[in-house]
Swiss-Prot record:
Record GO biological process: rRNA processing
Subcellular location: Cytoplasm
Name of the molecule in the record: Endoribonuclease YbeY
A molecular function (GO) term: metalloendopeptidase activity
Cofactors that this protein relies on: Zn(2+)
Gene that this sequence comes from: ybeY
InterPro entries: MetalPrtase_cat_dom_sf_prd, YbeY, YbeY_CS
Protein role: Single strand-specific metallo-endoribonuclease involved in late-stage 70S ribosome quality control and in maturation of the 3' terminus of the 16S rRNA.
PANTHER family: ENDORIBONUCLEASE YBEY, CHLOROPLASTIC (PTHR46986:SF1)
Length: 166
């Protein structure tokens, strides 16, 4: 079972909770244990602040992934972590890339969930593995390959900030 906490801190229209639940369950399906996940939908100001705080970049990015660092055995329901999604950025990217808004949202949520499971795209081999899994999961949901038009270019990915700030 997925315990999903959807926090809406954006004035911009976004998908409903049922869509987020579907996309999260798909992205997390390889994890058999119950899990807790928070998704916070933000506008560009908060997205920029968080990206600056955690990654020292002064712009809002599409998705930030914050994996939990508490051991599963310490919690009633294992906390996977948090996704912060900048609604205007995701909507704008969909338009700029000629993708349906729904398909791009599904991609960003699944991409963020995979980061919470430990997937990354720092090097080419990791990126290929992660992208292949994204393609498979999105295809099962009936969405097109998010990288089909972008095979030779660098792919815009969400970012996983380090929690080594303590």
């Amino acid at each position: 079972m997925l315990e999903l906490d959807l926090q809406i801190a954006s004035e911009t229209s976004a998908p409903d909770e049922a869509r987020f639940r579907l996309w999260c369950e798909m992205g997390l399906r390889q994890r058999s244990a119950d899990s807790e996940l928070t998704i916070r939908l933000v506008d560009e100001n908060e997205g920029r602040e968080l990206n600056h705080t955690w990654r020292h970049k002064n712009y809002a990015t599409n998705v930030l992934s914050f994996p939990a660092d508490a051991p599963d055995d310490m919690l009633d329901i294992p906390l996977l972590g948090d996704l912060v999604i900048c609604v205007p950025v995701v909507n704008r990217e969909a338009a700029e890339q000629g993708k349906s808004v729904d398909a791009h949202w599904a991609h960003m949520v699944i991409h963020g969930c995979l980061h919470l499971l430990g997937y990354d795209h720092i090097d080419d081999e990791e990126a290929e593995e992660m992208e292949a899994l994204e393609r498979t999961l999105l295809e099962e949901l009936g969405y097109p390959d998010p990288y089909a038009e972008d095979e030779s270019a660098d792919h815009p990915h969400s970012d996983t900030p380090s929690k080594d700030h303590e």
